[in-house]
């Protein structure tokens, strides 16, 4: 995949923003992601704002459009919702002029190593990742692309993402840079590299290939040292790297490894997410301590 030129990136970003403008829709706290310095995101999180004259869609089960409202924020936190035109003194007023205001969306399953577009043909991702991470120049290019994919999430209205397998320590690095205002992007809960087995799903690309329980536990300790937010397992085969029918749901990780990883992760205060694409994979995950099932396809 070739990185966009600066001009191409600006044109695509402008097109996305134009779509939002035409639809008259704003996602709450997406404003820091609009054109401007990353410092604006940090500034927004430390000031008082009144988003006035909004048509509010609050995200509840029985949500209806609620016209004529003003959303008050302080330090990046919603503090009140009041009638339009009644914001108290001390707030910077932003007149939405009847645009629709939504809560930020949350994407619970993200791999920032990819754009999310459909892969047209099989690739040797392990070989590709090894080549990318082998020198500083290609690493820098790859990290820039990861940052761009995260920004795309924000521009699409996603204000929080949960990564479940990434390149090296890119995800925690980007999470921390966004948190201090160096980069523009959503809040990130990061797993960094997941844990697979030799020949398993994403082994060698966005997950390490653990041949033994000790190697799997070493990766749990590694992501703990990296400051990750969760642990990711690849229990069954997957669709994207399957070379023959039946592989996606095939059990790859032994149950005893799943249990050992979950016990170590839980002792360190982590939850464990697991890629499973078969009833057998789901059963192994649930019986051995996994906290969340990813995909769960049959």
Feature map (PLM): residue ranges:
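Short, acidic/polar
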Residues: 142-150, 211-223, 277-281
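Metal-associated gating/positioning segment near the N- to mid-region
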Residues: 100-177, 288
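Divalent metal-dependent hydrolysis catalytic cores, especially in the metallo-beta-lactamase
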Residues: 135-136, 145-171, 185-196, 228-242, ...
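Active-site core of metal-dependent hydrolases
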Residues: 198, 237-298
């Amino acid at each position: 995949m070739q990185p966009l030129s600066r001009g191409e990136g600006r044109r695509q970003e402008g097109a996305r923003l134009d779509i939002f403008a035409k639809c008259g829709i704003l996602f709450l706290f997406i404003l820091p992601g609009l054109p401007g310095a990353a410092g604006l995101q940090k500034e927004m999180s430390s000031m008082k704002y009144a988003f006035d004259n909004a048509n509010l869609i609050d995200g509840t089960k029985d949500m209806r459009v609620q016209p004529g409202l003003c959303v008050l924020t302080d330090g990046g936190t919603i503090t009140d919702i009041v009638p339009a035109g009644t914001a108290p003194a001390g707030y910077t007023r932003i007149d939405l002029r009847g645009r629709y205001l939504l809560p930020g969306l949350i994407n619970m399953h993200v791999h920032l190593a990819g754009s999310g577009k459909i892969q047209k043909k099989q690739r040797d991702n392990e070989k590709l990742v090894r080549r990318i991470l082998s020198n500083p120049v290609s690493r820098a290019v790859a990290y820039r692309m990861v940052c761009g994919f995260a920004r795309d999430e924000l521009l699409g209205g996603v204000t929080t993402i949960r990564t479940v397998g990434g390149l090296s320590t890119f995800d925690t690095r980007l999470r921390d840079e966004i948190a201090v205002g160096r980069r523009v992007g959503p809040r990130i809960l990061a797993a960094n590299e997941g844990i697979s087995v030799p020949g398993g799903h994403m082994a060698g690309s966005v997950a390490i290939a653990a041949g033994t329980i000790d190697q799997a536990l070493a990766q749990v300790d590694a992501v703990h040292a990296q400051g990750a937010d969760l642990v990711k397992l690849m229990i069954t085969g997957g669709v994207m790297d399957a070379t023959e029918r039946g592989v996606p749901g095939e059990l790859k990780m032994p149950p005893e490894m799943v249990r050992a990883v979950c016990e170590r992760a839980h002792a360190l205060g982590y939850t464990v997410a697991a890629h499973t694409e078969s009833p057998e994979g789901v059963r192994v995950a649930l019986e051995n301590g996994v906290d969340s099932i990813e995909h769960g396809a049959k």
